[in-house]
């Protein structure tokens, strides 16, 4: 408890404190329960401050906005580790993600499927859905 008081004195309150050792232990416990063929994904909207800690614990980081994508870019997250999700993806959002090398997207509608397929074909002329 003294440690928390010293953290509050140093950083002020409110202050969020994360135990990365405990986080890693819990993620390893999840990994032991889930079949190896199942990939683990962390949605950074839950807490973008945990990106660095989660990078080594999951195979994929999910982003749902251009802002979250930019945070990952700035933190050096490899594009092949990013899943771009979200129902409000625009053409510009998908193009930017593809420019950065993102290749994994969720499709929430037939419109999204067409949009991503068309843009993927433009980025890779050999691709055709």
Language-model features: locations:
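A charged N-terminal "starter" segment
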Residues: 1-129
């Amino acid at each position: 408890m003294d440690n928390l008081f010293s953290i509050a004195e140093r950083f002020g309150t409110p202050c969020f404190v994360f135990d990365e050792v405990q986080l890693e232990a819990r993620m390893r416990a999840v990994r032991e329960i889930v079949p190896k063929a199942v990939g683990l994904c962390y949605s950074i909207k839950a807490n973008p401050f945990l990106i660095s800690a989660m990078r080594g614990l999951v195979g994929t980081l999910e982003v749902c906005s251009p802002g979250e994508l930019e945070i990952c870019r700035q933190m050096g997250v490899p594009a092949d580790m990013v899943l771009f999700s979200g129902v409000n993806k625009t053409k510009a959002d998908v193009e930017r993600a593809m420019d950065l090398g993102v290749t994994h997207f969720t499709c929430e509608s037939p419109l999204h499927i067409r949009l991503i397929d068309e843009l993927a074909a433009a980025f890779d002329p050999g691709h055709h859905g």
